Amino acid sequence: MGLLLLILASAVLGSFLTLLAQFLLLYRRQPEPRADEAARAGDGFRYLKPVPGLPLREYLYGGGAEELAACSSEAGASSTPTPDSPAPPTLETCYFLNATILFLFRELRDTALARRWVTKKIKVEFEELLQTKTAGRLLEGLSLRDVFLGDTVPFIKTIRLVRPVVASGTGEPDDPDGDALPATCPEELAFEAEVEYNGGFHLAIDVDLVFGKSAYLFVKLSRVVGRLRFVLTRVPFTHWFFSFVEDPLIDFEVRSQFEGRPMPQLTSIIVNQLKKIIKRKHTLPSYKIRFKPFFPYQALQGFEEDEELIHIQQWALTEGRLKVTLLECSRLFIFGSYDRETNVHCTLELSSGVWEEKQRSSIKTVELIKGNLQSVGLTLRLVQSTDGYAGHVIIETVAPNSPAAMADLQRGDRLIAIGGVKITSTLQVLKLIKQAGDRVLVYYQRPAGQSSQDSLGQLEESFLSSSCQAAYEEDAAGLSADTENRDLDSEFEDLASDVRVQTELKEETQPLSHSPKRTPTTLSIKPLGAISPVLNRKLISGIHPPPQKLPSKEGNKPSTLKTSETTEAAQVSKPQGPTFKPPVPPRPQGRVPLPPTDTSAQADPEAPEKPDKVLLPPPPADKPAEKQVKSVDQGEDVAAGKQSSAKQEGVKDLPSESSAPTKDSSDDPQMWESSEVLYRNKVGKWSRTRASCVFDIEACHRYLNIALWCRDPFKLGGLICLGHVSLKLEEVALGCLATSNMEYLTKFRLEPPTPKAMVTRTALRNLSMQKGFNDKFCFGDITIHFKYLKEGEPDHHIVPNVEKEKELHLVEEVSTLPKEEHFVGQMSLSENKHSFQDTQFQNPTWCDYCKKKVWTKAASQCMFCAYVCHKKCQEKCLAETPLCGATERRIDRTLKNLRLEGQDPLLGLPPRVEIEANKSVNKTTGLTRHIINTSSRLLNLRQVSKTRLSEPGTDLVEPSPKHTPNTSDNEGSDTEVCGSNSPSKRGNSAGIKLMRKEGGLDDSVFIAVKEIGRDLYRGLPTEERIQKLEFMLDKLQNEIDQELEHNNSLVREEKETNDTRKKSVLSAALAKSGERLQALTLLMIHYRAGIEDIETLENLSLDQHSKKMNKYADDTEEDLDSEISQLIDSQPFSNISDDLFGPSESV
């Protein structure tokens, strides 16, 4: 009985276990894919990077937690493996590789292709040899008589993987199984192999010597034994190379003849020279960068402008609706480094020509309310063109709280027309304003990125620097005049008649008000693609009704955008909050958008040949016109909130949680701008729902121009181009036609942007010394998906709510900076501890901790948040506020000079105290100071650290405060306000005092250097003098950058070495480097004094202008002509060359 019960229980248990196993196998749920993967799979395509399997990952990354930790720590220090890296215990044999190479060699050795390749390489070496100094003097020519490739190939005995293997920082999660191994493919692979060769490769050369002599040389490679390094890498661009780790053992068989007679005496000389060549070119650290045969796509691409287009019947191959989806960008070169973290965005443009970066500016209109005043507060200057064309008038200064200042006219604005009359001279401006009534309509041009904050807090930006696209551009043409005034003059030929029409309509449509009204103006007469549409927005957005609610950044000043895009006077004259995107000019194009009530919504494509009229913003329409560019951004920031009115600073973007699909705010059907994404770990990824747009391509379109941008962290509203690429639409169309689903996905290498002057490419310095380096490959790549939509096919895929919520959550996690802080352009969101560096400042600087002035201009500055403090305040600052608020600090730094409401002086009566206070802070410094400060922040320029300058037991001699001169450029004491027994004074002032003692320099040296520098080039005209001084300052800045890099490398070597003798050598080298840095600093002060001398003269002239404007404000209108003549006689720029600049005029 018991046996039966046991059998029954076993049967029941077996049945239960069988059913349970079947249930688990058949009904278990599959793991859910990630939100972005599911969305792309639902849309018909998936983009996943190749990843190694677990066995390969164990081989690459070690397979153990301890070894992995060691690899990760070493990977952070250096991306290039060194020969001292730890090796796995076992070595690999490569019999399969040797057999494969031998088989391929046997099949290819005697082919014409292989022999042509070998002879071509040999001839290249001959050409390089003839170009050398020594050989070039003796050799007339080299010719190859015979070459034999040998009967075998190099034999690889053993090979090992060099550790550490650096994983790609793509942000992808690790394996969910819990293995502590990177899931991504390596960024760099390096192998070391023991190689032996005795194949008998030889070649015979005929040599033509000078004086008609000839010689014969036979060289045979008998034996080679050595250790070879083979590297595959993606940094900074994809390439490979091989080189010997150390000097190999090489045996040569050499025979030489001179005029038919043997010359055995030359054998040893030739062998030694061949070994030196191998050591110099093919032994680490020297190598040749190679692309073929693994990466042939890295070759440069050209554009053929005259090629014929492909047509199918009467339609061009490219015509249709093209959906473009941005996937990711990687390896971007940002501010001289590949490891920066910042926000990037992309612009796409359809054009008939390749991408070209040009000056961006906006044409604006303002209504100037003159009232009963006889002066509007403007000082003008006529800038003559160097190419023979008529000059143009620019605004030199704007009096505070004057009618011009209330109308938001700024220094550097170019006046185009007044009251419908084109401006050609300053006298014409004076006459037109005098003849006008209480109100006058002014057309002016302003560079992109220049805002009202620049006029209040950054008056040092002159009109010369505003012609540059960013603070790092070096444009010599901008020093004399606007380089594009020929094109601008042609744009305004028909302006006069159009302005009068606009004035009449404006009076009917706009209510009467005492506030100045501003209306953006769009001019479109240039051919398609004449100007690059970098972040362009149409200034006319009346075609589409604006959103109903736009939250304001300042709660007490709600902003209501009208269709005519006018702003009230309070918003014009008061400093507004910074914009999320800077206003930029419209894209001149052939087809002009018209109001939706018009039957002809688009003009003929050939319209560029006809001058277009100035367009007026139409009244609000019932329905928006159908756009040709549609954004399929679900959950994207509502771009319609980014209206391009002249005063959009008070407007925020709508919340990104909007669930309905929105359309891009740009009215340009050929332009689209993506949302910003965080770029870190050498990669930036777009979400599918935030990076798709649809273009309607027509026959006139030939290229899709793509550009990547980031914000300039040192200039409000500034943008820096990181790279661009122009794609032929025919190639895209052919790629889509290759598959039936009409999709095409590929990666494009970015072309370099316009060269920047002061960006030192530190990350590329070592690599650029190698043969085969091309800096055009160093600007990263972008991966894009294309799809031609069929007729009737929807332009976007409806994502389920669950997947959308997951994706929005994923986007929030990777998200970038708060929207209020985007304009600051900080490099990282995370709060870091202060990282202070000793910095030499050029501008008057105040301590952010004790709020007192840094008299020596040498203080400590945080690398992340630009926090400045005295060296004596550094310890207190770290104790109280160890974390740096990068966002708050930069906002405060940017806005600290803005005046608050109610603090402006009365009209025409600026107090003397305010002028004197602003003179010390907001001195007109021109381009030089801004470039120097920017370069200093980027490269963290600092003096020699205390630890390298001081030795134990050195006595410090404190100078008496009475010997400290009253100057801002000398090396005075930072601690004059403290007592002589102050511990902060004794401890933290040691660096400067010790440098002064060791270098043998005191205050008199700095004073003498500065005083002598004030007389530099004084006999030259002002512009020529500025150019010479700035050239020398740029040259010195580059020298300081290089010396600092050399100094830092010596410090690292000194810390790493344990050899006492080597340490002493490095200490001596550090001392010499410190002396050189000190000498370069003195030279910088020397030449900087010349610039300050020019600024002092200009400030004195501006003071005279202010006095005269106050005087003229009380005079009558009948005396205006005589006052103008007096002002011309006493204008402060009479020493400037008359062929470039005319006299300044005050209005």
UniProtKB/Swiss-Prot annotation:
Residues 580-596 have a biased composition (Pro residues). One of its GO terms (biological process) is mitochondrial calcium ion homeostasis. Its main location: endoplasmic reticulum. The chain crosses the membrane at residues 2-24. One of its GO terms (cellular component) is mitochondrion. Residues 510-524, 557-576, 978-987, 1126-1137 have a biased composition (Polar residues). It holds the Pfam family C1_1. It comes from the Eukaryota. The SMP-LTD domain is a barrel-like domain that binds phospholipids. Molecular tethering protein that connects endoplasmic reticulum and mitochondria membranes. PDZD8-dependent endoplasmic reticulum-mitochondria membrane tethering is essential for endoplasmic reticulum-mitochondria Ca(2+) transfer. In neurons, involved in the regulation of dendritic Ca(2+) dynamics by regulating mitochondrial Ca(2+) uptake in neurons. This is PDZ domain-containing protein 8. The gene is Pdzd8.
